[in-house]
């Protein structure tokens, strides 16, 4: 009996080391950033079983077998649709400003189509204004409405949007709603999901959380886009979820969320529609390619309309494009660069680009919330402050709530707005969307919004920052080490 237990013990030990070695080899063989690999190895060696389970659950990009097959199957028809769209030559821009030229060339070469022109844009910075405008557009819809949000939180004006959407479905408008399973858990536990389906709305729970399949699909891969398309002509996107800030996370201690949304009319709605159709097919298997844009761009629209490139990220879309776009934007800056983000955990490349811009004389400002709803990200972001301040970057800490706006403005003319946070999860993991806008008028509007944020912020003093307590520095470095995983 003693011999039996000895053999079993040795087999368990051998199996343990084989498992550790196998996971280590798998991490090393994957194409990933060195800091990310080192962070995973440290976790696995310090907490072996917990680390291995965490890595198998969250360490690799698993879309799931069924979704991966759908993504492969949809590409030929999507590619044909994009090729056919090129026949609508009147919607594509032929020239761009000098500051936007490099970025638009990058987007065109990687996505296969140029930016679209003749769009009319309106920036909305108040949640009530966003929802009232959306309700009006829903009430005037004639054919179809498509929506996708990371979070839909019942309560307040979000319920009025839901009521207007159900009324539209009852009068014959084809309504589709896709919500992330994790982000919108409160919605799916409420009566609203059943009420909407009973009204005729197609409601899809995207990337459904299922602990029984935790090793078959990455659970923290999330549908993070916020988009609305109406009649293939009106579109919304930005940082705002379908929540009323007065009812959302009131016990988080960070104040009301502050967001920005863009309301658009024009061909950009078609570009966003193809992104939505891909998401819908990956999730449901149903193909809903949008029709070509039924618009004739008049001369005055061509002269005054905004030129926009739509960049989507996530499985099935050009890899690393949003990250490349941010790098290109930073390196294109000549006068000033302003960034706003709630979560700041940049890649080494992006951090280097931001610091280099400041060191070559560009006026660089980053606006972050003073209080963050994520303790981990809050501490990790502080670990980058010393290097940024040393390079001459201005760091503004917003004190008017949780600044949730994601925006970049370069030289007053090139703008990026959308759903992308400046962290690893948004840059390389989630389904995200960003608009790249080449227009000085829109840039002026965005600059006014960012100036308002700065007026409600405190400029971080580099002299005081270096005097912070030792325990804070240690905590920052600890979270900095694990920043590639956040």
Swiss-Prot record:
Annotated transmembrane regions: 3-23, 38-58
UniProt keywords, alphabetically: Cell inner membrane, Cell membrane, Lipid biosynthesis, Lipid metabolism, Membrane, Phospholipid biosynthesis, Phospholipid metabolism, Repeat, Transferase, Transmembrane, Transmembrane helix
BP GO annotations: cardiolipin biosynthetic process
One example GO MF annotation: cardiolipin synthase activity
Keyword Transmembrane helix: yes
Database matches in InterPro entries: Cardiolipin_synthase, CL_synthase_A, CLS_N, PLD-like_dom, PLipase_D/transphosphatidylase
GO CC, one annotated term: plasma membrane
A Pfam family reported for this protein in Swiss-Prot or TrEMBL: PLDc_2
EC category name: transferase
Compartment(s) where it occurs, according to its Swiss-Prot or TrEMBL record: Cell inner membrane
Function: Catalyzes the reversible phosphatidyl group transfer from one phosphatidylglycerol molecule to another to form cardiolipin (CL) (diphosphatidylglycerol) and glycerol.
Protein known as: Cardiolipin synthase A
Gene name linked to the record: clsA
């Amino acid at each position: 009996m003693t011999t039996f237990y000895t053999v079993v013990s040795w087999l368990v030990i051998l199996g343990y080391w084989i498992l550790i070695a196998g996971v280590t080899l798998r991490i090393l063989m994957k194409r990933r950033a060195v800091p990310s690999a080192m962070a995973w190895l440290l976790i696995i060696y310090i907490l072996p079983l917990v680390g291995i389970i965490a890595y198998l659950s969250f360490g690799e990009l698993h879309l799931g077998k069924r979704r991966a097959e759908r993504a492969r199957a949809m590409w030929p028809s999507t590619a044909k649709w994009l090729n056919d769209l090129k026949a609508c030559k009147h919607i594509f821009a032929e020239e761009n400003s000098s500051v936007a030229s490099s970025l638009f060339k990058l987007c065109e070469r990687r996505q296969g189509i140029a930016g679209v022109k003749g769009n009319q844009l309106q920036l909305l910075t108040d949640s009530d204004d966003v929802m009232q405008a959306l309700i009006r557009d829903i009430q005037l819809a004639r054919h179809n409405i498509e929506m996708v949000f990371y979070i839909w939180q019942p309560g307040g004006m979000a319920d009025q949007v839901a009521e207007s959407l159900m009324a539209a479905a009852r009068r014959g408008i084809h309504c589709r709603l896709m919500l992330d399973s994790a982000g919108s858990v409160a919605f799916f536990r409420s009566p609203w999901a059943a009420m909407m389906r009973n009204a005729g709305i197609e409601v899809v729970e995207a990337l459904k959380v299922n602990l029984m399949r935790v090793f078959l699909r990455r659970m923290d891969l999330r549908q993070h886009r916020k988009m609305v398309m109406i009649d293939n002509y009106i579109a919304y996107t930005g940082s705002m979820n379908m929540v009323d800030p007065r009812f959302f996370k009131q016990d988080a201690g960070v104040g009301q969320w502050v967001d920005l949304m863009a309301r658009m009319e024009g061909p950009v709605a078609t570009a966003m529609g193809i992104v939505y159709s891909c998401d819908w097919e990956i999730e449901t298997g149903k193909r809903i390619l949008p029709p070509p844009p039924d618009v004739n761009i008049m001369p005055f629209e061509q002269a005054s309309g905004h030129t926009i490139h739509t960049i989507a990220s996530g499985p099935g879309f050009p890899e690393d494009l949003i990250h490349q776009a941010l790098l290109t934007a930073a390196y294109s800056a000549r006068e000033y660069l302003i960034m706003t983000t709630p979560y700041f955990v940049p890649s080494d490349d992006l951090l280097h680009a931001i610091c280099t811009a400041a060191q070559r004389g560009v006026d660089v400002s980053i606006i972050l919330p003073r209080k963050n709803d994520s303790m981990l990200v809050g501490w990790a972001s502080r670990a980058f402050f010393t290097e940024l301040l040393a390079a001459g970057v201005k760091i503004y800490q917003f004190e008017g709530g949780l600044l949730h706006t994601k925006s970049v403005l370069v030289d007053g003319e090139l703008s990026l707005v959308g759903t992308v946070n400046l962290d690893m999860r948004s840059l390389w993991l989630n389904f995200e969307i960003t608009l790249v806008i080449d227009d000085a008028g829109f840039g002026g509007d965005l600059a006014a919004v960012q100036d308002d944020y700065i007026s409600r912020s405190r400029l971080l003093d580099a002299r005081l920052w270096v005097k912070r307590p030792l325990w804070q520095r240690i905590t920052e470095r600890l979270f900095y080490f694990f920043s590639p995983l956040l």
